[in-house]
Amino acid sequence: FKPYLLVQTCANFNWYDDEGLDKAYNQDNVANSGFSIPYAVLGFTGKAFGKVAFNLSINAAASGGALLQQAWFDVQLKKQFAVRVGKFKTPFSHAYLTTLGETLLPQLPVSLTSAVILPYSLNAVTPNIGTGFDLGVEIHGLVADKFGYEVGLFNGTGSSVNTATKTLSDDWHIPSLLYAGRFTYMPKGVMPSTQGNPNRLNEDKIMFGVSASINVESENESTNDTRVGVEFAMLKNKLYLGAEAYYMNVGFTDRQKINESYNYLGGYVQGGYFVAPRLQAALRYDFFNRNGTGDDGFLNMPAVGMNYFFKGCNLKLQAMYQYIARTGHDTQLDRDNDNLGLATHSATVMLQYTF
């Protein structure tokens, strides 16, 4: 039994282009800036009877269903087969870490978290590629100490919903759930859930992964969303490298009477290197075909950052700057629409404490 704590406090600056701003309402280019607390997590984890692991954590900085960050138990019958039930990370993308506070940069890739653009005025249909945390059940295991698998069923409603709201698909006559799976190959043993830790500078690990999911009747029973991803991660002494590419197809349910489906691509490459024993430099290039493969143009999103780990007190200082560029669009209107709601220039300085 082990209690734990994570508190993050940020100073944020975001500058938005004029597109989408209504000067009549005195909307400024600088918005969503100031101080924030994205996470104030209190939880406990442990293992009972030699085979039942458990974890419960509350994020006091959130509201609604998102207050419950994680709540699960895991029954390991053997290393090759275990069952996990509750609220936990879905099997897609290693950008979402289960180890608190060990991400390379304080902001996740925009290509995972930003809603895609659809050419229809359906306010309830705002899917993004990342699936994050959700409620469900999963079987998982490690075979021959290098082949990992995760296969599960989830609500598909995300981390902010803790209730059973799903039904049966009118089109496919199956439960309207998120069906997801992920398979990894780790030839040098299990990849640690970290993107940089000054206490683990002698690691030599590498991981290759592939994942797929389909969210049946998602977005208020409007769409069937299919996702496929490939990933790579490496820890080699002072160096961390990570890369992912993902694809999403959004197809509408029959009741919407929209025959077209839409395809989206995204991905990122990021790396961190400890230039000093407690100072890690970080770079990321993020790519997002936000308006779909049927239209030209995409978002280029380079980012730079640094992490400083204070000695002997579990404090970590992170800083990050990101620029969102647009390229290859057919018209100025397409270019203007592609980054609506996204800050062209964003900077974050975050101090976090873990216990």
Predicted regions and their residues:
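Detector for outer-membrane/organellar transmembrane beta-barrel domains
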Residues: R182-N291, N300
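Outer membrane beta-barrel transmembrane domains
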Residues: G272, R278-R326
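Outer-membrane beta-barrel "beta-signal"
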Residues: L178-V190, F310, L315, N339-F355
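Membrane-embedded beta-strand positions in outer-membrane beta-barrel channels/transporters
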Residues: Y39-V41, Q70, G136, A180-R182, ...
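Outer-membrane beta-barrel proteins
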Residues: N14-D18, G65-L67, H94-L97, S160-T163, ...
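Extracytoplasmic loops and strand-loop junctions of Gram-negative outer membrane beta-barrel proteins
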Residues: K23-Q27, I117-N123, A164-K166, A212-V216, ...
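Outer membrane beta-barrel
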Residues: F1-S159, P175-V190, R200-L201, Q270-F287, ...
